[in-house]
Each structure stands twice: as C-alpha cells, then as structure tokens.
Swiss-Prot record, chain A:
<comment type="subunit">
    <text>Heterotetramer of one alpha, one beta, one delta and one gamma chain.</text>
</comment>
<dbReference type="InterPro" id="IPR029061">
    <property type="entry name" value="THDP-binding"/>
</dbReference>
<dbReference type="Pfam" id="PF02775">
    <property type="entry name" value="TPP_enzyme_C"/>
</dbReference>
<dbReference type="GO" id="GO:0030976">
    <property type="term" value="F:thiamine pyrophosphate binding"/>
</dbReference>
<feature type="binding site">
    <location>
        <position position="210"/>
    </location>
    <ligand>
        <name>[4Fe-4S] cluster</name>
    </ligand>
</feature>
<dbReference type="GO" id="GO:0051539">
    <property type="term" value="F:4 iron, 4 sulfur cluster binding"/>
</dbReference>
<protein>
    <recommendedName>
        <fullName>Pyruvate synthase subunit PorB</fullName>
        <ecNumber>1.2.7.1</ecNumber>
    </recommendedName>
</protein>
<dbReference type="GO" id="GO:0019164">
    <property type="term" value="F:pyruvate synthase activity"/>
</dbReference>
<dbReference type="GO" id="GO:0046872">
    <property type="term" value="F:metal ion binding"/>
</dbReference>
UniProtKB/Swiss-Prot annotation, chain B:
<dbReference type="InterPro" id="IPR009014">
    <property type="entry name" value="Transketo_C/PFOR_II"/>
</dbReference>
<dbReference type="InterPro" id="IPR033412">
    <property type="entry name" value="PFOR_II"/>
</dbReference>
<comment type="subunit">
    <text>Heterotetramer of one alpha, one beta, one delta and one gamma chain.</text>
</comment>
<dbReference type="GO" id="GO:0006979">
    <property type="term" value="P:response to oxidative stress"/>
</dbReference>
<dbReference type="InterPro" id="IPR050722">
    <property type="entry name" value="Pyruvate:ferred/Flavod_OxRd"/>
</dbReference>
<dbReference type="Pfam" id="PF01855">
    <property type="entry name" value="POR_N"/>
</dbReference>
<keyword id="KW-0560">Oxidoreductase</keyword>
<dbReference type="GO" id="GO:0019164">
    <property type="term" value="F:pyruvate synthase activity"/>
</dbReference>
<protein>
    <recommendedName>
        <fullName>Pyruvate synthase subunit PorA</fullName>
        <ecNumber>1.2.7.1</ecNumber>
    </recommendedName>
</protein>
Length: 296, 402
C-alpha cells in the first residue's frame, strides 16, 4: 500500500453519532473499492444518517431499497450492468449492518451468492439492531445485554453465541470471504480492494463497535475494535474458496475481561452473582478462536 | 369479418407463450422472476428464449423468491435497464413491500400478473384478489380482457411507465388460467412494429459512477409528503397518456382494446354492466342476447384500475338507469368488491345520480355462467325501476355449504 491514504468517497457532515462505527466502515470500504463503485445499502443507521433528503454524503452512485433485499438489489444492479455492457468498469458493493445481513436479509443474500453475482458484500457488524435502539440480532455475542435480551435477575443477557456468518458465506462457494475490523483500517481497505477485484460474490465481515449500543466513550471506537482482536474475540482471517489462507496473529492475547469491562453491555457480568463464571465462558470462546484459527 | 390478410397473421398459441413473446419483443435488459402457478409458463417460455439466445442484451436472474425478483428489478431499473417480471397470488403478495419501494423510487418496472386467488384456503384458480390487494402500492394496474390484449398492453405499459413525466411502474393484470393457459388465435407482436412503437428506455436519472446520484434517500416529515404528492401527480398524468398510447398503438398495429375504459353497446344503454378482465367476454355474449330482444343493455369495461378513471366512468354511466358492478374480489369488512366501492365513490363527487349495485363473483376460479349474468341484469332492471339499491352480495353462494 502507498503511504498516501486512498481517497474516500463519503463526505463528512452526515448525521451519525460521534464516534460512529458505520461512518468508519463506509469510509474504509470506499477507500478500498474506489470511485467506480455503485453502493447498495440496506436500511439501517448508515442509510438514515448519510442521506437526509435533500442532502447526501455519497460521492458514488448509491441506492437504498429495503431492509431485507440488498443482496437481491445488488444482483439486479450487477445483471443490469452486464446487460448494458458496463460491468467491466464498475464495481458493485453492498454495505449493510448485522441485522440486514445476518437476519432479515439472509435469504436474499444467500440467493445472490448462490447465483454467483459479481459483487462484494460488506457486513458492518455492530452486534445488535442499533438503528431501532439496541435490540438483539444473530450477531449479538453471548451474554451481551440488549433491549430485547436485557440482563436481569435471572438473565445474563443474550443466551446464544454469534451466528458464524463468514462460514455460512464461505459455504456458498464464495471465492473470497474475510473478516476484518474498523480498528485496522489498512487491513480493511486491503481486503475490500482484494474482494472487489475478485470476480464472483465476495464477503467481508467487519467488526464495527457502536459507542451508543455498547456503552463506551465516543472517542474509543477504534480502541475497542482493536481490543476485540487483541483478546481474540474477533479473529481476523481470509478464506479463499472455502479454505483459510491467512490469519492475523495475536502474539500476546489479552484477557477478555479487559474488553468486557470497557463496555456497558457487559457491565452486569461484573456485578451479578455468577458473573465470574460467565466471563470464563466468554474466555473459553476466545480460547477456542486461538486454537481453531491458530491465532498464536 | 376478419380481413383475410390479418387472419393470415394469426396463430393459435397458449396465452402464456404469447405474453412471453410480447415481453421478448419489448427488448428487456433484465428479467427476474420466480415460478408460481399460473404464471409459470410465462417465465418458462422466457427462459427458453434466453436459452436459445433470442433475447439480446438481456440477463435473466433466477431468483430464490418473488421478493428478490422485484428487488433485483429495482436495482436493475435504477441502473437504466428495461426490466420485466411476471407473478401472481402469493408471489405478488410476497412482493408487497418492494412494490411500494419500486413506485416510491419511481422506477418504471413492468410486470404481468396472472391473477389468482390468495390463501387461505389455498387455491390456485383465478380471481382478482391478489392485484386488488396491491391497489395502494402506487403501481399502475391495467386489466385485460383476452390474450391479444394481454400481449398488446405490455409495450403500451412500458411506453407509459417510462415516460419521464410519469416514471411509475405498472402491472398488466390477466386472468390466471382463463387467459394464461388458454389457446386462442392471436397475432404475435412483430419486432419491427414494436421497435417503431416503443423507444429504448432513456431515464433521466440512473446509478452511474460518472454522475453519482443517491436513490432511495431518507425523508423526514419536512419532505416526505411532497414525494407522495408528486407520485399522485404522476398517476394523474398517466390518465391521458394511457388513452393516447392505446390510440398510438392502434395506429401502428391496427388493434384497439380501449384506453382507460371501453364500451360495448354503451352509448344508449339503460342498464350498464361494469367489470374488469376476461369476464367481459361472457357479459358481452349475454348482452348480445338482450340486444337481440331490443333491450338496451351495455357493457363498461374498466381497463385502468390504477390510475382510476373517475371522470371517464361518470361520463360513461351518466345516462344509464342503473349500473351493476361485477367484482372478482372482496374487501372483507365492507361486503363489497373494490371496483364497486370506487365507482360509487367517484359518482358521489359528481353530478351523475345513477343507482349502482354490486356483486362479488367468481372467487377462487368459480365459473360464472351466462345464466348468472342474466340473473344479475334482471336484478339491475328492477333497481332501475325502483331506484332502490341493495347491499352488495356474493353471486351464486352455495347455501348448503355454509
């Protein structure tokens, strides 16, 4: 990569919260994809904050249709570019949150990948439905407190682990699936660039911490993102044709407690009886990642 | 008497084949559809055309559901492609949310709907409930009477939808099975005539990196209402355009099926039977018998249900003694079919004072025999005399099943 950062194609002046992860994710995605890109954005924070009519932060052609159809809209965009003889020059990139990607839009996304459309899907995973007020998604991690899985007298929060979305997308026969994090902009830009240059449906799963939903200071977004990687709760790897081909090593993994303690959504684990046991379970997830992805 | 030269052009083909052929000669760039009875044959024929390389510059997207079929066309249309789909019943209902989105973004997608009843109970046969349930989605809806009209209306609807003053999507509603699966003589649309009639799609705004634009933005209470107003205005502009396009079509192809509405024995009619779709053929047969006896019965075909031709309907029935509306649908909770309700609604705001009665008929493919139409006409004659209108009712209910 050159020392000069690539230009991005999303302007400031949007109405995102201070420290917004989506703004970072969109920015890094476009830095990787470049100006010859059509962006498809399902409903979510990013769409709402970047296009309050008559304003728009997008300096590339951009379309938002619905919450659950970005995969299908991207299919149509790609098919039309092909039919009109424009596909060679233009990249098609969809940027969606975990709700639209992993839950309501999974059917349309699966269809698009199975059909082999040439586009890149970037999931900015902030681990809950932030646009509607921090409700659980299938990307919400184990024991996180959300407004629909709140911690309470008999609950430690979300009772299930995250859905393994990268594995699902790789299982579609995607030529390229990668995880990344907005805490590592160079990594994200490189992976998006690589994904958009590969022909076929490619998928990037980006960790995107949300200060509002997770409960941390707005200046700490990138710091928290880095901490997730350093505690091995967010392994960063690339998969080509279903095989893991590259892993970002974590030499000295930090205890998950550091990551959990920094966020209000896990606060109950430090105050409730039995919280220590729960933290051990989360440490076990990180330990499994270390072993499975050979992070060390 | 059919001109022998014209007769020579006629072929007997399945309705679905004829419609698929029509879609083909309209030169779509992206077709996206999911098979569902009784639309299936349309998309199968199109798939075969694709497999035989007969549709140039076109991509066929074999989606995993109707919701994605319409969503793919949203993306494709926004890039500047002419787009086509066909669906029916549950498939059309599955598209519901995206139908609003298509029209709200003012994307002129065109679709054939092979009308079918909706679940539950599941039923695959014809009525109009599926399309009527989409009446507020902001799509144009043109209902056709026979296969020839189903074919001929496609290029007309593209021309109307893609007019830069309008830019509203539209559906050609044809009765499932009755028209989609019937073999009848038709003239398949000629490519050269269609190229002459239907210019290439040239939208003013598209998704293009050379000139980036934002589609489907977020609108606050400050701006949202104006989008709705402009959408309604576009529909109003479509009213004269539908009329004009039907006439232009006639000039090029020599066939006319009506514009917004069409009349049969209507000018001096004392009793008017109003309906949409293939039932009109049966109604016309019954009316012929009445006319042979010297009774002044006429038929008002409503071709455009959206936009709704209020003015034309008021004018068409102003001299009638009574009007009866036959609806292959019901808005449950009103005991009325939609055409009946809307007809009464537009008459109320006019100076026309005609008694109007309604029947909801032919649900789930139930046959509508000529005897029943005659019975309806007899009831309407009574209303014409008494001036007393009656509650809308189901036709030919089987009391023993209740």
């Amino acid at each position: 990569m050159s020392k000069t950062a690539p230009k991005t194609y999303i302007t400031s002046g949007h109405s995102g919260c201070a420290g917004c992860c989506d703004a970072f994710a969109a920015k890094f995605t476009l830095m990787g994809a470049g100006p010859n890109t059509i962006v498809i954005n399902p409903t979510g924070c990013l769409e709402v904050m970047s296009t309050p009519f008559p304003y728009s932060s997008w300096q590339v052609p951009w379309i938002h249709s619905l919450f659950e159809n970005a995969g299908a809209v991207a299919s149509g965009v790609e098919a039309a570019l092909k039919a009109l003889g424009k596909k060679d020059d233009v990249k098609v990139v969809s940027i969606g949150g975990d709700g639209s990607t992993m839950d309501i839009g999974l059917g349309a996304l699966s269809g698009a990948f199975e059909r082999g459309h040439d586009f890149t899907y970037v999931c900015m995973d902030n681990e809950a439905y932030m646009n509607t007020g921090v409700q659980r998604s299938s990307g919400t991690p184990f024991d996180a407190s959300t407004t629909t899985t709140p911690a309470g007298k008999v609950s430690f929060g979300n009772p299930r682990p995250k859905k393994n979305m990268p594995a699902i997308m790789a299982a579609h026969g995607s030529p390229y699936v990668a995880t990344t994090s907005i805490g590592f902009p160079r990594d994200m830009i490189r992976k998006v660039k690589k994904a958009t240059e590969i022909v076929g449906p490619t998928y990037i799963h980006a960790q995107a911490p949300c200060p509002t939903g997770w409960g941390f200071d707005t200046s700490k977004t990138l710091e928290i993102a880095k901490l997730a990687v350093e505690t091995c709760l967010w392994p960063m790897y690339e998969m080509e044709n279903g095989e893991i081909t590259q892993v970002r090593k974590v030499k000295n993994p930090r205890p998950v407690e550091e990551y959990l303690r920094a966020q209000k959504r896990f606060k109950h684990l430090f105050t409730m009886e039995g919280g220590e046991e729960e933290i051990k379970k989360i440490q076990a997830i990180a330990d499994w990642n270390i072993k499975h992805f050979e992070l060390q | 008497m059919i001109d022998p030269a014209y007769r020579k052009k006629m072929v007997v083909v399945e309705g679905s084949y004829a419609v698929a052929h029509s879609a083909k000669v309209c030169r779509p760039n992206v077709i996206s559809a999911y098979p569902i009875t009784p639309q299936t044959h349309i998309v199968e024929h199109l798939s075969q055309f694709m497999a035989d390389g007969e549709i140039p510059n076109c991509e066929y997207v074999n989606v995993e559901a109707e919701f994605s079929a319409i969503s793919a066309l949203i993306g494709a249309s926004a890039v500047g492609a002419r787009t086509y789909s066909a669906t029916t019943s549950q498939g059309l209902l599955l598209m519901h949310e995206a139908l609003f989105n298509t029209s709200g973004m003012r994307l002129p997608v065109v679709m054939t709907v092979a009308n079918r009843a909706v679940s539950a109970p599941i039923n695959i046969w014809n009525d109009h409930q599926d399309a009527i349930a989409q009446r507020d989605t902001g799509w144009m809806q043109l209902y056709v009477e026979d296969v020839q009209e189903a074919c001929d209306t496609l290029p007309q609807l593209y021309k109307i939808a893609e007019d830069n003053e309008i830019m509203v999507p539209g559906m050609v509603c044809m009765d499932g099975f009755i028209l989609s699966h019937v073999y009848e003589p038709v003239v398949l649309l000629e490519q050269d005539l269609t190229d002459n009639f239907l210019p290439p799609f040239q939208p003013e705004d598209i998704l293009d990196p050379e000139d980036p634009k934002t589609f489907g933005a977020f609108a606050s209470p400050d701006t949202y209402e104006e989008f709705r107003y402009l959408h309604e205005q576009a529909m109003q502009k479509a009213l004269p355009k539908i009329e004009a396009t039907a006439k232009e079509f006639e000039e090029v192809y020599g066939r006319y099926h009506g514009g917004l509405i069409d009349g049969y024995m209507l000018d001096d009619a004392e009793i008017v039977v109003m309906a949409m779709g293939s039932i009109l053929g049966t109604v016309k047969d019954v009316v012929d018998k009445y006319r042979a006896k010297g009774e002044k019965i006429g038929v008002l075909k409503v071709r455009s249900f959206r936009p709704f031709p209020k003015e034309q309907i008021c004018k068409a029935v102003k001299n009638a003694h009574a009007v009866v509306v036959l609806d292959k649908n019901i808005s449950i909770g009103t005991n009325e079919g939609a055409l009946f309700t809307e007809t009464k609604s537009c008459l109320y705001n006019s100076k026309v004072r005609v008694p109007v009665i309604g029947y909801t008929i032919g649900h789930g493919g139930r046959d509508i025999p000529v005897e029943s139409i005659a019975k309806v006409i007899e009831e309407t004659k009574k209303v014409a005399k008494s001036g007393i209108t009656i509650e809308s009712q189901f036709m030919d209910l089987k009391e023993e099943l209740l």
